[in-house]
Amino acid sequence: HPFQIGAIRLNKEEIEFEDANKGDKPTMELLVANTSDRLYTPVLMHLPPYLSAVAIPEKLGRGRTGKIKITLDTEKLPKLGLTTASVYLSRFLGDKVGEENEIPVSAVLLPDFSHISQQERLNPPAIHLSAEELQMGELESDEKKAHTIIIKNVGKSNLEIRDLQVFNSALGVQLKKRVLKPGASTKLKITAFGQNLKKVKGTPRVLMITNDPNNPKIIIKVKVTSKK
């Protein structure tokens, strides 16, 4: 339980549902340890409509451990690709929400390829990236740094970038073209902002949803930290 929120310790600092398909109801578990000297009731506040949570057991005695089981209802996700939110761990009865007890949530809904024709299946687009991980080092709070990735369609039909999103405000993205003919390429510019790095939890990364059936989801990780 490496992450601490008040007297409560958790095994994760973010809640992630990586590859969800429409109609699925995946679950994940957040392990909870009560290091306070009183009885604790684990509650997640401000749950979005597509998430539900149950604490097992409902109450934790002093020094006891338990878990919160979280279920994602994919039918209630608003769109394809990335949906993010924040939930808040209640540390005690009547707790308020704030930065200290915030837990970021992300869910990625994948496109459905079950209806594509045999012709499309045999001649798919294929995405190729010049890099899938960027090393940007340390940034001062007033500094920003940009890197460019080349995206190429090495497949047999038009490649569509259907969705392009960042997981948090530490990054910005610019994409020249959303549709690439076979053999064509384009530039994706990723910028890291030092001033926002201190505020965010989790790894800064970029998500792309494409119509390449073999690579419907691509995550670009950006290794960057703020100078203390």
Predicted segment positions?
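C-terminal functional regions that serve as terminal interaction/effector modules
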Residues: 189-198, 214
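Long, low-complexity ectodomains and other extracytoplasmic segments of secretory-pathway proteins
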Residues: 1-36, 92-150, 154-155, 212-228
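Short, solvent-exposed loop/turn segments enriched in Ser/Thr/Gly
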Residues: 11-13, 22-29, 64-66, 75-88, ...
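Beta-strand-rich extracellular modules
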Residues: 73, 90-94, 193, 209-213
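Extended hydrophobic-aromatic, low-complexity segments
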Residues: 159-162, 199, 218
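Low-complexity, intrinsically disordered segments enriched in Ser/Thr together with acidic residues
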Residues: 65-74, 184, 188-192
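Beta-strand-rich interaction surfaces with strong enrichment in secreted/lumenal proteins
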Residues: 18, 55-60, 74-75, 137, ...
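Surface-exposed binding patches on compact interaction domains or structured appendages
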Residues: 37-65, 156-185
